Amino acid sequence: MKASKYILPTEKENPSDAVVASHRLMIRAGLARKSSAGLYFYLPLGLKILQKIKQIIREEMNKTGALEFDLPILTPSDFWEQSGRWTAMGKEMFRIKDRHDLSYALGPTHEESFSFLLKPLLKSYKDLPLNVYQIQTKFRDEIRPRFGVIRSREFIMKDAYSFHIDDVSLDETYQSMRAAYRKIFDRCGLKTIPVQADSGSMGGSASEEFMVVSPIGEETLLLCNSCGYSSNSEKTPLVLKKENVSSASVEKKEISTPGKKTIVEVSAFLEIPESTTIKAVTLKSEKKKILVYLRGDLELNLHKLHSLLRIVDSEPMTDAEIRELGLVPGFIAPVAPNDKVKVLYDRSLQKDFPYVVASNKEDFHTQGFVLEKEVSGLPEFADVALAREGDLCPNCNAPLKAEKGIEVGHIFKLGEKYTKAFGIQVLDQNGKARTLTMGCYGIGVNRTMATVIEQRNDEKGIFWPISIAPFEVTLVSITKGEEQYSKAEEFYNVLKNENLEVFWDDRDVGPGFKLKDSELIGFPIRVTIGKKFFENGEISIYNRKADKEESFVFAGFENLIARVESLRQELFAELE
């Protein structure tokens, strides 16, 4: 490909609305342009990268025996109502009506559609296991699209679904897909960490996210360097060191705390650690009011809470709603379970520890409050607090380390959630009808592209892994006159005829402009012929990743091809 025949709109300046490297560099390198909030045009260079990522995904999926499909993006509301997710998906799902007043969704995922399609096609255990996938545009009405294509409203996703006669078969495919995902991301040049995760509205018994450690990540990962445990903080069980204080050593008494409502204010006023207090969190869902007590230095984990109570969402109670429960806003004391509100105590609390708690009276707290003595019918404690760095590993009790991460893939064991909803059954070996169990496996294609940039950039621009670079080799020619141009074209044709992906920058612009563009875009290998070549036969080959250039005297095309191919193989080997 010749640059003179290509669209190459590189930019010197960063876009004003870009706050992360991938967004800045995708625009500056001419890979994409913004359409509107969360929507992007892909230009030829960017599209080539996406196509290469898709091809890697397709190759590895096909190796597992998965079959590729193509389903409609527009999905009827009947499918979603049958699974119970027409409401559960909330405002993030785009919903539309046609001229006949029939409701549809722009598919954010396709469990329902594949279940509907495959139900009449699966008759017997002999048809199983079946693993199906597609690579398709999805839609999500993000409340705050951000970070360029990392969190957008339209995106390309590889979504796969597997169907099984039992959980043993499901686990075999799950592990096969887990291995395939590691291979896919390795080939794309990404270092990923599989972490235990919350399944959210997808449902199911287990899931893992494939995370890339990055300071711009929106997820918090908790990792154990001792045993290798890894989990999203949303999923991590909280394990704390027990406080060794006798309840008899602290006298119970009420103390004045004028105007001190928050844990921070109370702790500072009384000069005590926040961990010796109890905080109350008041919430409501569509069906119930919720009152959660946890240790004062901890935060409530809404994902754990929603999963425990099997609710989709929650929001804070108003002061009026709190008062209706006989409680004082800002000064809520621990209470026993009752019919008015769902009461939960987090397992960060100790039954026999003397805490400082609010007194359910304006401007007063109580010290020496022991839960097992003061709260009748104390319920079993639940794990609803957010685990943090320094808390103990649930496997080996070593301290956990926190990292920020970007999710590029997610795999689920869905169980029978969708197969039951759609009545998908087959006859087993004994002629008995069995409800199938499912798995689900997703990869964000655009997000993978952006995350590679986040991991592989420097002050000059991007350095693509050779496997997904828009072109493997760029030929930069600095010529004067038709004779020199013709010689450069000979180099281009020779390289191209060796089945190398070559981008020839033959534009009539200055050499500095060409060299900077090649480094900004991130072509893995650059061959430069210019003044030194035409004077004394000197050529240079530049390794973008290593930022290293080697010059040598041209000794024929065979020698040049050998040098380029050697570097090419070296760059591919780094991805294995």
UniProtKB/Swiss-Prot annotation:
Classification via Pfam families: HGTP_anticodon, tRNA-synt_2b, tRNA_edit
Alphabetical list of PROSITE patterns matching this protein: AA_TRNA_LIGASE_II (PS50862)
NCBIfam families referenced in this protein's UniProt entry, alphabetically: PRK09194.1 (NF006625), proS_fam_II (TIGR00409)
Alphabetized PANTHER family for the sequence: MITOCHONDRIAL RIBOSOME PROTEIN L39/PROLYL-TRNA LIGASE FAMILY MEMBER, PROLINE--TRNA LIGASE
Quaternary state and interactors: Homodimer.
Family in the record: Belongs to the class-II aminoacyl-tRNA synthetase family. ProS type 1 subfamily.
UniProt protein name: Proline--tRNA ligase
Organism listed in the record: Leptospira borgpetersenii serovar Hardjo-bovis (strain JB197)
Gene name per UniProt: proS
